[in-house]
Structures are given as C-alpha cells and as structure tokens.
Amino acid sequence: MGPLVRIEPYNYLYLKVKLEDCEEIFEKTILRGEPVERLMYHDDHKVYETQEEIPFYAEQTRLVLKNCGHIDAEHIEEAIAAGAYESFEKAVFEMTPEAVIKSVLDSGLRGRGGAGFPTGRKWSQVAGQKEKVRYVVCNGDEGDPGAFMDRSVMEGDPHRMIEGMMIAAYAVQAHEGYIYVRAEYPLAVRRLKIAIEQAEEKGLLGDNILGTGFSFHLHINRGAGAFVCGEGSALTLSLIHI
C-alpha cells in the first residue's frame, strides 16, 4: 500500500504515491482542497477518503500510535501539548511504586511480542529482587527480520516510549535505562537523542526529576542488527559487551 501520504487538514489518505503524483496532489489537494480519488483506497462500491472510513480501520482506535504523524517528533513542546509525561507525573506525584505495579497488573497489560507475558508480573518480579541496582531496557531492535513496529513509535513519538520507560523505572526503582535500537534506524536514533536531550533540559530526565527525588538517566545503544532467535539474555549481554 505504501508509500502512504496523509494530507492535513483534510485527512485524505493516498496510497502507493509516486514522484510523478506529487504535482497533481499539490495542484488539486494543497491548492484547492480537492481529493485525488485515484490514489485513495477503494473497493468495488466506494472510494474511501480517510483511513478512518476504511472498513478494516473503522472500528479501531489508535492508542500507541495516535500522535504519530500529528506532532513534530523533534519538538518536545508538541509532545507535551498532546499529553506527554502526564501519566508519569501522576505516577510519581500521586502513587507509590507498589501502586503503579498493581495498576498495571489490574489492567491486564501484556507483552506484544507473541508470548503475552503480563507486564505487571514482570515489573513485580524486578521490584522484588534483593539487588538494589536495577535497569530498564527497551528492545527497539525488534529482532524479527523486516519488523517495523517499534521503529514507528521511535520515529513518530519518541517521548511516548521514553515516558513508558520512566514509569517502569519508577515502579521498579531503577535509575538507569537503555534503549537498544538498530543502527539501521538512523532517523529513530537521531530523534531519540533529541528527545532525551530535550527531556533533560525540561527537568523530565536526569537527577531529581521535577523535584521528586527520583532520578533516571537514559542511554542509547546502537545494535548491529541481528536476529536473536528469542534468546532472552542475548540483548542484555550485548549491552555489557560480553
């Protein structure tokens, strides 16, 4: 279906856009607000101007990706205006780490990698460890050849991912985090770096976040890009160069 182009403010969705289509898109849609119907999704009965009208998507609600394409991923102010870091603020100001874990357990949230392991159980196991030095690691490498899920979030809404790591860190009382991302994702790496720097400038990352006494430092590790075949320790071992 790609390359896909969404035209704001009309919300038109164009499919399989080629370079030679750009002039028509500019003249009809950008200048006159008219749709280019031949580039839209259609079946035997209807042309669908927006993604939301397409039957497959009509009953769906975007959650994780809802800001992607609607905010400038390199400006933290736009992310904050869209609600970024509000959940972290609620967690750190209104809830104990134990309450955060219970909330995640009660939500039924599970991993999306296929195994469906309950996220709250994973967090509670980490929080229950005797060792007080803990880490939060985000697997942005994806592992599966050709996978594209995590890249979409890292490139389109990096602050959402960072906030999730911060909530996890507060819940398990970790003060260091690592994002393991493919070196083949240069745009994702760049936007994550910018997002981390901007969050640090706003006092949302680093020491004594928002004056709460909780500290969390985030680092990026660029992986070589390999299929780890589901071996759970491979990624973490590569972080410490074993």
Q: Where are the model-predicted features located?
A:
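Feature of Fe-S/electron-transfer and energy-metabolism proteins
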Residues: 1-240
